Amino acid sequence: MGIIHSLSPDLINQIAAGEVIESTHSILKELIENSIDAGASKIEIATESAGLGRILVSDDGHGITKEDLPLAIKRYATSKIQTFHDLEHLFTFGFRGEALASIASVSRLVIESGTEGNRMAQRVVVEEGKVVSEEEIPFFQGTKIEIKDLFYNTPVRRKFLKTESGEEKKNRTRVQTMALGEPSIGFRYVQNGKEVFHVQKEEPLERVLSIYGENLRDHLLPVHSSRNGMTLRGFISHPDFYKSSRMGQFFFVNNRSVELKFSAQILKRCYGELLPSGAFPYAFLFFDLPREFVDVNVHPQKKEVRFLSEETITGILFQGITEVLRTSTPVEFLEMRRRLSMPIPYHSSADKSQFGGEGMSMGGPGFGFGMAGRGQAVWGSQNEEGNPLLGPSSIEGRAGFSLDGIGAGTNLHLLGDNLTKHNLFVPKKHYGVIFETFILAEAEDGLYIIDQHTAHERIRYEEVLRDLKSKAYKSQSLLTPIRLELTKEEAEEMIAEKHRFSELGITLEPFSGGTILIREVPSYIDPGKETETILDLWERFKSKDPEEKELYDEMAKCVACRSAIKKGDQVSDPIIGELLQRLSYCENPSLCPHGRPTLIKLTRKDLETMFHRI
């Protein structure tokens, strides 16, 4: 007797549900896509118990006719395609006719729908994939789909889901991402009876800010790139604003949210050294492509797509991002590109332009672009009182600060009264900066090359950590509180951890919706850096749960990274002297807080060996 047999239709649907329905968030995706395809101008979503108890998605789209309602839950029944040619020219999100059939096989399903020109709407009740009742109801335009008792007949599926809070977070992320991709549609999302967010039809930038916070407004750069009828549009963040994970990166192909396997590599190449190690830019990027150029039928959940020419897409992406970085951060971008890809010209003799306090001149053909509203950061300028400043100018030209208020005329040897000298690095004199990044200095034991950013980062890290451990800082009340604009759930999560911020001298207060007020900040955070430092710290909180000792360490790293001199910043001779002297008093002057080297040493013997003198 044969052992191979055909599966029942019910079992086939349940198996298919395992491919299409990964979790409750994948159900939300399928239902919202149906609403978008139906031409909805507003979509409302409600979930209870992470969607396992109840899911309701309603829209004002064109609806489903009485004749089509029973077919809507049949597998491979669809209004989207009829021929293979249609599959190659899709204008809709859905096309397989699998979603409702799969959902109906593992839940109790109710569909209500009304279409234009009818006096009554229709209602069908479905259990285990079969229609158990049909009736007419009062008319409304659009469709409502209610799902209850998800996976009631496949309990093993429930067992492998995350915790309820984990599933709720994934649901929020899914709905927000889909709302991000459709700014011309209004969205409202309610979770366990509480409104999570509500957005009206708006422009793409406003949709990004509505969902991910007004705090992004001043840090986003518009991207636009076109080639052969293909367009890239959207926004990326300025290099001074980033996250500690890729959770702020979103990519859409013809408004469909997708995972692009090459996106991380392209972003890394484009930003390069403009970002510190472990930092990831925000990206909200949309590809508008000819339908025949994209194959969306390559993944069960349509998470991935295939392009006719991936090289073309990566080229458009690279061109769009590099162009906006070149024009928005020209000094930093120019230096990074030259270090990465251009040969350094040979000079037979050194002059002031190469090794003096003004920095090395790197001018050349093809780089004669200007800068709108942003000047090259200069460390060591004179303020109104005539004191040297150790802080880069901001976009508005804000003055910086001095390193612990030490002026150029300070007797640096007196610092030893308050600091322990470790004698690992004792500079005698310096010879300026090369490549606007590396300081050349001489000590008794050799020639040192010092990275101005990582060196200053080490200094600031140890100073802030020392202040935190000894409680030597003061918290300063702000006359005008600083507003943090976040999503509602982010604001709630942040306020729930306000005791951690309080331990660091930061006072946070909930205001309304997703707004948080910063009432007090510690003296060790530089003026103008409060928002980005606190948000950076919050990103670190979310990725781990630091104890008090680690809390101080994370805060010191955040402040050091944000306040340190950057690559490309011009540094005056007095400030170089301060920097080197301060570095010599550090407990570990050879490494930055993230483990990167701050300096390398060439001994006299090393040099003589290189020149074959010994």
UniProtKB/Swiss-Prot annotation:
It comes from Leptospira biflexa serovar Patoc (strain Patoc 1 / ATCC 23582 / Paris). This is DNA mismatch repair protein MutL. PANTHER family: DNA MISMATCH REPAIR PROTEIN MLH, PMS, MUTL, DNA MISMATCH REPAIR PROTEIN MLH1. GO terms for molecular function: ATP binding; ATP hydrolysis activity; ATP-dependent DNA damage sensor activity; mismatched DNA binding. GO terms for cellular component: mismatch repair complex. GO terms for biological process: mismatch repair. Gene3D superfamilies: 3.30.230.10, Histidine kinase-like ATPase, C-terminal domain, MutL, C-terminal domain, dimerisation subdomain, MutL, C-terminal domain, regulatory subdomain. This protein is involved in the repair of mismatches in DNA. It is required for dam-dependent methyl-directed DNA mismatch repair. May act as a 'molecular matchmaker', a protein that promotes the formation of a stable complex between two or more DNA-binding proteins in an ATP-dependent manner without itself being part of a final effector complex. Belongs to the DNA mismatch repair MutL/HexB family. It comes from the Bacteria. It holds the Pfam family DNA_mis_repair. NCBIfam families: mutl. Keywords: DNA damage, DNA repair.
